[in-house]
Amino acid sequence: MTERNFLIELGTEELPPKALRTLAEAFSSNFEAELKTAALVHQGIEWFATPRRLALKVTALATGQADSVVEKRGPAISAAFDAEGNPTKAAQGWARGNGITVEQADTLKTEKGEWLLYKQEVKGKPAQELLSGLAAAALAKLPIPKPMRWGNNEIQFIRPVKTLTMLLGDELIEGNILGADSARIIRGHRFMGEAEFTIDNADQYPAILEERGKVMANYEARKAIILEGAKKAALEVGGIADLEDELVEEVTSLVEWPVVLTASFEENFLNVPTEALVYTMKGDQKYFPVYDAEGNLIPKFIFVTNIESKDPRQIIEGNEKVVRPRLADAEFFFKTDRKRPLVDRLPELEKAIFQKQLGTIKDKTDRITELAGYIAEQIGADVTNAKRAGLLAKCDLMTSMVFEFTDTQGVMGMHYARHDGEAEDVALALYEQYMPRFAGDKLPSTGVSAAVAMADKIDTLVGIFGIGQAPKGSDPFALRRAALGVLRIIVEKDYSLDLVDLIAKARAQFGDKLTNANVEDEVIDFMLGRFRAWYQDEGHSVDVILAVLALRPTQPADFDKRVKAVSHFRSLDAAESLAAANKRVGNILAKFDGELPLAVDSSLLLEDAEKALAEKVEAMIATLAPVFAEGNYQQALSELATLREPVDAFFDNVMVMADDEKLKVNRLTMLNLLRNEFLKVADISLVQK
């Protein structure tokens, strides 16, 4: 069978830049799945994406399906013929349904019996008949949260579709997808090259688009040009470009012909906090800031234009003219905000609602203040500074700068607090209260910052759960992130804090505002649930995490030690045997209805194996007492692992459920004591080797 390259390009109005890569990759994987289902063999798929097109090029695509034989099994021979050997109605109906006679059927012989069999030869369809439908199916499955309609039809897609091109080699594949008829017309760049041109063969793509249309369809190639150009441009002005990948991706998705240029802004704007300037450059204008070797912002920025100009200076001056008013606004807000100390803005927080049932942001501030002071006392941080930071934590929300540039909340609070003469610990906490903001983000650097950060997050968790709004699908209050943030701070800073205590303290701050009587248990369960995902990402197996969760430990730092200890235990040779023994003991004890003594009666030990185990268990309990007191769970489990042989010998040679009630109870007591030592770490019965 012959092979040819296949091209599909969908020309659209401007696609959402932040979704472009996702759409292109999904289109590629969807189409590959459709080809597999259709049994159309190919060598590979390359995707292309620009602001105004999605395209795929399938290399070495078979021009048709291979012929195949489909086996259709009929009734059993015993049911297909009567005693005289004549076909039954069942056999005749089956044959008729397949367009044959019973006599034309084959026989399928297996160990389980014999059946009528029809081997139907299926002629493969040419690719030309299939490709349009496969492409439509792939596009229909794209992840589009908000499709739109256009014109007078009911067709929906992420943006209006203008052109469609489908070529199998040099052959045009006809079809209509999303309201566009397949044609050889390709659209070029809006301002350069040919506005439209004809493509004759799929092999010409994407080179013809670049040559005639001045469009670089290869997404990764555009990204590479932007990265290399920005790095070079920054070096030329003695700096280093801030090439955050998320912004680079967005800029790549905004241009079809990237040209990297460097511009400047007035040096006096550097008196404004860097974060506000960067927010304006990156967030509003999609510019790349430039820093010197010490990490200080310099009055330069790098931007990417979508056109190759004979006079780039005009484009540079245009961008400088655009950014100047935004930087001037930031400068004005900064100067104006500093005329009033942060603390004077506290009354304004009474006008801002945090959540209707939970009150104002001022109410939240009061709760954070008390809880932060309490936490600071527990972790040995400065209580006075923690309370002061809690009091000022949300005041910057009332400043002009944060109102205009919302992403600067926290960091502007820090700058304003420093200007007001607040203690450095207090100022820093206003910035670090939001840490960690995402997975892998830095943690608060001081005890005061950590206390305020935890207080803020715990207050939100308890409040929202307390009014019955636990997250299900959506998470508008970012409770999952808040829970993980608290856990990370406690674990990674090794604070001896108990969630039960913290959550109870937080709940008390709400007075009678909360309506959910189970709020404390629900918040703890929710937070413990975050552990599973976190520790799986860290490489711990699910069974290890569940073994620890079974005990519902509420001290996160202690939880961390247990997980690491059980992970280590799981790697030992004795783990499988002792996990099975724990499971067996658990099942045996579950069937016993009654109370067990607190100690083994040595006079009732008859078998050598039980005497040996009893002696080992008694000695082990004494050995482990100081080990558990230190919280050294890894050492405890390593010690317990040495009991593998006496435990195995006990189960091999001793009947636990003896007829003699006293013997049975005594043996159960010994096993209970042994299991309790393991349960001081985790439920080892859940560990799977």
From Swiss-Prot:
UniProt keyword rRNA-binding present: no
InterPro entries recorded: DALR_anticod-bd (IPR008909), Gly-tRNA-synth_bsu (IPR015944), Gly-tRNA-synth_heterodimer (IPR006194)
GO cellular component: cytosol
GO biological process: arginyl-tRNA aminoacylation; glycyl-tRNA aminoacylation
Coarse class of the protein's main subcellular location: cytoplasm
Subcellular location as annotated: Cytoplasm
Lineage start: Bacteria, Pseudomonadati, Pseudomonadota, Gammaproteobacteria, Vibrionales
Name the UniProt record assigns to this protein: Glycine--tRNA ligase beta subunit
PROSITE patterns: AA_TRNA_LIGASE_II_GLYAB (PS50861)
